[in-house]
From Swiss-Prot:
This protein's record includes keyword Amino-acid biosynthesis: yes
Pfam families from the UniProt entry: M20_dimer (PF07687), Peptidase_M20 (PF01546)
Pathway it works in: Amino-acid biosynthesis; L-lysine biosynthesis via DAP pathway; LL-2,6-diaminopimelate from (S)-tetrahydrodipicolinate (acetylase route): step 3/3
Protein name: N-acetyldiaminopimelate deacetylase
Catalysed reactions, semicolon-separated: N-acetyl-(2S,6S)-2,6-diaminopimelate + H2O = (2S,6S)-2,6-diaminopimelate + acetate
SUPFAM superfamilies in UniProt: Bacterial exopeptidase dimerisation domain, Zn-dependent exopeptidases
Molecular function, one GO term: N-acetyldiaminopimelate deacetylase activity
Family the entry assigns: Belongs to the peptidase M20A family. N-acetyldiaminopimelate deacetylase subfamily.
Sorted UniProt keywords: Amino-acid biosynthesis, Diaminopimelate biosynthesis, Hydrolase, Lysine biosynthesis
HAMAP family listed in its UniProt record: DapEL (MF_01692)
InterPro entries on file: AcetylDAP_deacetylase, Amidohydrolase, Bact_exopeptidase_dim_dom, Peptidase_M20, Peptidase_M20_dimer
GO biological process: diaminopimelate biosynthetic process; lysine biosynthetic process via diaminopimelate
């Protein structure tokens, strides 16, 4: 018999929706939650997200658990019988697993409340434009603001049954990068009468990397990645405009500030050198996931005692996750959950092993009951 929450994961996998468009997802989650014993439950909607409070038997504090619910604009290539019904969208970052795990934990505590209050946060728009900060600033969240908060993220590189975590910095600071170049177009036969923005943008890509190699302390770490370049429309016309889309990832907010300062300085020089306009366009920012040491060490001790084969010391990663905004104000942690997939996060063929779902539910229930 298929595990109930694996079946739920497959349902959710078929209806992936991007940030703040998670209407079917929200409706599915609400329909499921409405069937749970409701004596101890209170439910609030926030935009396309949901907050569920499970009232404790003798509450002294509120413990939060957050899951993200959105998908990515990726065309799925898994060939699974339950692949995406929304062509062009895919749960390629495991949020379908995240949701099914959260529902599994919620289901248990709806019937068997813990001593303290539990707040389940079903957060939209993690992949962009970023839902953590806005939901934290909402009246709905403020009314039930937790004293601690936890979360997880699937990890294809770890085996099922493994949990990787570390105190301190787990995920990097991340900023989306969108740059436009505007010059003067013209006929390919008369380059001296135009300002070629393909040339300007291409040169800028290379020059950006000197920020990493020459402006960042070599004992620190930062990455600038340009994932998309677009310029011009026709092969025999010099491009009047060009666009660069990418990301910046750093291990500290201070290093992020250095990168941005140097980028803007370079842009001013480019405007002079290439007789063009260079403009930066706003994107999403993700604050570092910095695990609170005492909370994290408590979880590690729990794993070593109850799941001794599961604990794996994690390394800091350049991954971006807006759960960091929660941890910037509320103590807690995030951990990697092994799902043993040959394809990486954000890959069109990502196929996590579903056995990780009941395992994670079991770990979280036992940990929360131990609090």
């Amino acid at each position: 018999m298929l595990n109930e929450f694996i079946a739920i994961r497959r349902d959710l996998h078929q209806i992936p929706e991007t940030g703040y468009k998670e209407l079917k997802t929200q409706a599915y989650l609400l329909a499921y939650i409405s069937k749970l014993p409701n004596k101890h439950l209170e439910v609030k909607k926030w935009r396309t997200g949901i907050l569920v409070l499970v009232k404790g038997t003798k509450p002294e504090k509120t413990i939060g658990y957050r899951t993200d619910i959105d998908a990515l604009p990726i065309t799925e290539e898994t060939g699974l019988p339950f692949e995406s019904n929304h062509v062009g969208n895919m749960h390629a970052c495991g949020h379908d697993l995240h949701m099914s795990i959260a529902l599994g934990v919620l289901t248990h505590f709806a019937s068997k409340p813990a001593k303290d209050n539990l707040l389940f946060v079903f957060q939209p728009a993690e992949e962009g434009p970023g839902g953590a900060k806005p939901i934290m600033e909402s009246e709905e969240f403020a009314a039930w603001r937790p004293d601690t908060i936890y979360g997880l993220h699937i990890a294809p590189e770890y085996k099922v049954g493994e949990i990787a975590i570390k105190p301190g910095l787990l995920f990097a600071n991340t900023s989306e990068l969108f740059i436009s170049f505007k010059g003067k177009g013209g006929h390919a036969a008369y380059p001296h009468l135009a300002n070629d923005m393909v040339v300007a943008a291409s040169a800028f890509v290379g020059q950006m990397q000197t920020i990493i190699s020459r402006n960042i302390d070599p004992m620190d770490s930062a990455v600038i990645t340009i994932g998309r370049i677009h310029g011009g429309e026709i092969q025999n016309v010099i491009a009047e405009t060009a666009f660069l889309d990418g990301t910046i990832r750093t291990l500290s907010p201070e290093t992020m500030e250095i990168v941005w300062t140097r980028l803007k300085q370079l842009a001013k020089g480019w405007e002079e050198a290439y007789q063009c306009e260079v403009e930066f366009h706003p994107g999403s920012d993700y604050y570092q996931v910095d695990n609170e040491p005492l909370e994290t060490e408590e979880f590690i001790r729990f794993l070593k005692e109850h799941y001794p084969e599961s604990y794996v010391p994690a390394r800091s990663a350049m991954t971006g996750e807006d759960f960091g905004y929660f941890l910037s104000e509320i103590k807690g942690f995030m951990f990697w959950l092994g799902v043993d997939s040959e394809y990486s996060l954000h890959h069109a063929k990502l196929n996590p092993k579903e056995e990780a779902i009941p395992f994670a539910i079991d770990v979280l229930i036992n940990f929360l009951e131990s609090k």
